[in-house]
Amino acid sequence: MKSAKLGFLLRFFIFCSLNTLLLGGVNKIAEKICGDLKDPCKLDMNFGSCYEVHFRYFYNRTSKRCETFVFSGCNGNLNNFKLKIEREVACVAKYKPPR
């Protein structure tokens, strides 16, 4: 994923995550805009659309496990982790903040 696009997605993810804490009453609007971006682990794995080869981790909702896949280098989504520990911090319940 190109750094500018990844930066935008990360900022959007942070906005969606913090919106609940900061704006309280606007939760319904944020939910419509952000949807599952609050939790990258709810997103399906996406290979991307380029032709590079990057081995990455993603959370498989069906098997409830961390699995590897080959990322193409651009596009894709936030369910795409370079390190297994990054995926665990994002997707394992004991590391997630309480809701």
UniProtKB/Swiss-Prot annotation:
InterPro entries attached to this UniProt entry: Kunitz_BPTI (IPR002223), Kunitz_BPTI_sf (IPR036880), SPINT4 (IPR042943)
Keywords attached to this entry: Disulfide bond, Protease inhibitor, Secreted, Serine protease inhibitor, Signal
Keyword Membrane listed: no
Endpoints of the signal sequence: 1-24
Keyword Cytoplasm attached: no
Compartments in which it is found: Secreted
One Pfam match: Kunitz_BPTI
One Gene Ontology MF term: serine-type endopeptidase inhibitor activity
Record domain BPTI/Kunitz inhibitor: where: 41-91
Main subcellular location of this protein, as a coarse class: secreted
Entry protein name: Kunitz-type protease inhibitor 4
This protein's encoding gene: SPINT4
